[in-house]
Amino acid sequence: MLGAVTVLVEACKKNDLTTISSRYHPTYLSFKIPAGWPQPPTDIFKTNPLTEEGFQLGKKLFYDGRLSKDGNFPCASCHQQFAAFATYDHQFSHGFNNSFTFRNAPALFNLAWMKEMHWDGGINHIEVQPLAPITNIKEMAENIGDVLKKLSIDSVYHRMFAAAFGDTAINSQRMLKALAQFMGSIQSFNSKYDQVKKGEASFTIAEQNGYATFQAKCNACHTEPLFTDNSFRNNGLSLDPILNDQGRMRITGKPADSLAFKVPSLRNIQYTGPYMHDGRIFSLSQVVAHYQTGIDISQPTLDPLLKNRLSITNQEKVDLVEFLQTLTDQVLLHDTRFEQPN
């Protein structure tokens, strides 16, 4: 009798899945590449079609503390929308059991243009990226199996997974795909700088002068329009003896990559401080000052472009900071589409 009941239950499950699949009509979304921007190096949605249902599921997961061990550290705890999905005013990420990481949380936008992620490039696909913080003992400190168990007892998730993927199965692949759809949709291309480029606004005199300085002194690494060339470079920061963070060399094992870190985008830089891979600098003026006088030119792996440091006047420095603030995308910072769901 028990066997018959088991067969009946399994049959019902299969019928339920078939019924849901027959009703699977997702709302497909297009991924916008702004005019004049390069094509992304890879199509992150090629095997993970972007849908409204997948996006909404990914957003719910992104803000859900149950992805962490104690429920207190969702992805959004370190990637806050008002800080361009970086961590506002915190040098290091704060995680489970009152732990801290040894790096500053990078901003999450325009990820479709990144072949490698993290300061050392240790992640090479957006669908893999969430695994690192979820399983890191100093961040979310959870294992994927337990995350899935917690999600599986929530009927809302059953409905959302079915809407996004065609049936109620909740597994790691689908969870990561949904997160990738949400994170990959976070784009920044609506700053004053972008409006100026489209002829919809004008720089002030100070901003225009700062832009000229930027083009002459900074654009080689922070290349427009992404304001990064996505390379890894040693920018002359002294090695913190406690952190002993060797940067890219931790991934490649190559001495030539010692102290090299990913060049961050300068978009939204007004709101993504503190700055550098370890958050050691707390103002844009101090960032510029580092390139003027703080570079350790004795380092053998120092990027050649920085050997002569940055030579600019005090007024050029002020104007440069004024220009950098035109890269703030207020649309992104306040877009209700990316807000925490109810």
Write out the residue ranges for each language-model feature:
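Periplasmic c-type cytochrome electron-transfer domains
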Residues: 12-342
